[in-house]
A protein has these predicted regions:
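Acidic/histidine-enriched, beta-strand-rich ligand/metal-binding domains
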Residues: 1-80
Length: 80
């Protein structure tokens, strides 16, 4: 879950899985985190809802280990 200051700068990020507060310095997330901002569509029971949540890297790893089919992972060729 993310909180922003009135000026739009990122203030804090808390893992929705375990409650860990992730490191944010000067509006920049300084550790591994996974953000979801998903707008549910017409064919869903959640149509019209947008879900926002964050996971720390450990909770992300725990989540994907539950998958029957692993996610596709590729190497990034450029880092921003």
């Amino acid at each position: 879950m993310r909180k922003y200051q009135e000026n739009g700068m990122l203030e804090s990020v808390v893992c929705n899985g375990c409650g860990k507060k992730l490191v944010v310095e000067r509006g920049i997330l300084r550790e591994g985190g996974f953000a979801v901002n998903y707008p549910w569509d017409y064919f869903s029971e959640k149509d019209g809802e947008i879900h926002h949540w964050d996971l720390c890297e450990d909770c992300y790893d725990s989540l994907i280990h539950q998958f029957v089919i692993a996610p596709e992972i590729e190497e990034a060729v450029e880092f921003m």
